[in-house]
Amino acid sequence: MKKMHGFTLIELMIVVAIIGVLASTALMQYQNFVVRSQVTRVLMEAGELRLAVEQCLNDGTTKIGNGQNECDPRASGSNIISGASQNPEIVIAANTGVVQFPNPLTEETALTATFNNSAASIIHGKKLIWQRQKSGSWYCHSNAAEKFLPSGCKYDASL
């Protein structure tokens, strides 16, 4: 009697099925990771402007611009945000956008970042907002799915 070597077809099919399940799970987790990293990136990019806005408000320069008694928070361009520069003297690179804010700035200024088509498809058109309160504190809210938001940012369906 000959001794059998190797695996049976059934055993190989089971291994291939297990690898397929693991690969599909890993792909879904990676896609969620990409979305979460983009949301966190925009949270930080928009959040950087809070200090500049506070400086403008403290100096009493609330109109956006480069002139005397004007303020430029210096919003830098991002390839996953939509929105034109609000300072007419500043030109941003093509296919980039900047965080939007009211002109003039107010005590309850909202820094609004809208995700463009370069962001993950599940967050196209979603907004992330840093909202200033009269007390000077800031809070973050967004209409992106809650599972993608960092712990410091709350889901808000009304946006």
UniProtKB/Swiss-Prot annotation:
It is found in: Fimbrium; Membrane. One of its GO terms (cellular component) is membrane. It is a single-pass membrane protein. It comes from Dichelobacter nodosus (Bacteroides nodosus). One of its GO terms (biological process) is cell adhesion. The pili are polar flexible filaments of about 5.4 nanometers diameter and 2.5 micrometers average length; they consist of only a single polypeptide chain arranged in a helical configuration of five subunits per turn in the assembled pilus. Disulfide bonds join 56-71, 140-153. It comes from the Bacteria. Keywords: Disulfide bond, Fimbrium, Membrane, Methylation, Transmembrane, Transmembrane helix. It holds the Pfam family N_methyl. The modification N-methylphenylalanine is found at residue 7. Belongs to the N-Me-Phe pilin family. Residues 1-6 form a propeptide. The chain crosses the membrane at residues 7-27. NCBIfam families: IV_pilin_GFxxxE. This is Probable minor fimbrial protein.
